[in-house]
């Protein structure tokens, strides 16, 4: 398969599974994905040991192949200014912070779009950016339960619900986010406009409750 997204630059401000899955898919399609990690510490999957490869978490290596990387402290002015400079020459920003975090840092979508009107912001959250759970953090285990996914797995109807072994809502949310970004890129090619893309672990769980 050809590198269809060659020339597309993605700033991945995401960690653990859902966001990095999306970034991984875009990188595999040829996009230049620059992973922005917090400092100190970096992506939490760096600490997912064992297994490891020469002391580096296998989970981290798996989720971040084909990506470039930079560490930024976005709580400091210098880090914010570097990020704003990067936005000027980027196409997509991918993040999975809690609702309002980017706005508190002074780099919400309104600010990004003034710097680069063609920028696409993709937000992955636990329960979406609206609704009663919008301010809550999200985790695969909880999303599998609250979406009803666990109710259709397990041994039989007389036994307790059972978690799907794989982090299914994380992975599916990454797939949904990548699909949304691809659609937004096509829309931008037609109109010249950037936009926000929003998906969630809850939405990803609902997908599997047919």
What is the predicted function of each stretch?
Residues 1-190:
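N-terminal helix-loop segment corresponding to the beta1-alpha1 unit
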Residues 185-210:
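Substrate-binding/catalytic subdomain of NAD(P)-dependent oxidoreductase enzymes
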């Amino acid at each position: 398969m050809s590198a269809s997204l060659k020339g597309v630059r993605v700033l991945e401000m995401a960690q653990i599974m859902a966001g990095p899955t999306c970034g991984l898919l875009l990188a595999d399609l040829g996009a230049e994905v620059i992973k922005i990690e917090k400092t100190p510490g970096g992506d939490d999957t760096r600490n997912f040991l064992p297994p490891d490869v020469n002391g580096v978490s296998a989970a981290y290596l798996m989720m971040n192949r084909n990506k470039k990387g930079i560490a930024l402290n976005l709580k400091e002015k210098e880090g914010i200014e570097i990020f704003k400079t990067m936005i000027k020459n980027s196409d997509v920003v991918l993040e999975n912070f809690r609702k309002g975090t980017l706005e508190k840092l002074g780099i919400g979508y309104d600010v990004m779009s003034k710097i680069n009107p063609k920028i696409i912001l993709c937000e992955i959250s636990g329960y979406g950016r609206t609704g009663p759970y919008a301010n809550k953090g999200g985790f695969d285990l909880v999303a599998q339960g609250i979406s009803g996914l666990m109710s259709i797995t397990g041994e039989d109807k007389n036994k307790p619900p059972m978690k799907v072994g794989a982090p299914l809502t994380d992975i599916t949310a990454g797939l949904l986010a990548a699909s949304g970004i691809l659609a937004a890129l096509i829309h931008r090619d037609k109109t010249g406009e950037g936009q926000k893309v929003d998906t969630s672990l809850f939405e990803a769980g609902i997908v599997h409750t047919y």
